[in-house]
Amino acid sequence: IFLFIEKMNKSSVFFQCFGCFKAKNKKDPVSSCFLMYGKNKFLKNEALVLSDCGVLENPDADTLASIASQSVKSAQAFGLEPRVAFLSYSSKGSAKSDAVDKVRTAYEKFKKKEKDIVCDGELQFDAAMVPSVAETKAKDSPLKGNANVLIYPDLQAGNICYKTMQYVGELNAIGPILQGLKKPVNDLSRGCSVNDIVVVSAITALQCEDKEEKKGE
């Protein structure tokens, strides 16, 4: 099921989606992720998953951990081996505040639940993405500056970052891809290209196929 409504803002689209298709699990949030890809020296021909850049404005630690779990599943569906970084303006205690504590707590909850996933937090963007910086700021991090699933502390940070990557970093941004609904439903930015529409349509079709396969198991 693919939903694209011209000239509607995201709030209107999401309101319609959530009215028609309920959450998969009442305990888990409905969130979103973006798939970022393109030629970039930091990506090394690999894509990134960014979350949540489109739905939840200010998730608490429990919700942030759930968003990360949903994003891991999305990354795996895209063929990635997820390496999750919980992002902050602090790296491993370099700053102290309630905002930093939220990110650190979310990481700890996620790590306890997803024992087989390589992850770390709280980390600054460069400590999560640049190996040479990680050696200084997060020497013992299992990510070693090679994260490919980036979990942002709130919607403002996530949305600003994906658009910066898209326009300044010249990466392709696919999404928001909705996570946590009973049926596959996705949205597109009003500034999307024809290629964006094609790719999101293909992703949504794959999500439908995945659900059908699970029904048959």
Please give the residue ranges for each predicted region:
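Anion-binding alpha/beta catalytic cores of soluble intermediary-metabolism enzymes, centered on
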Residues: 1-217
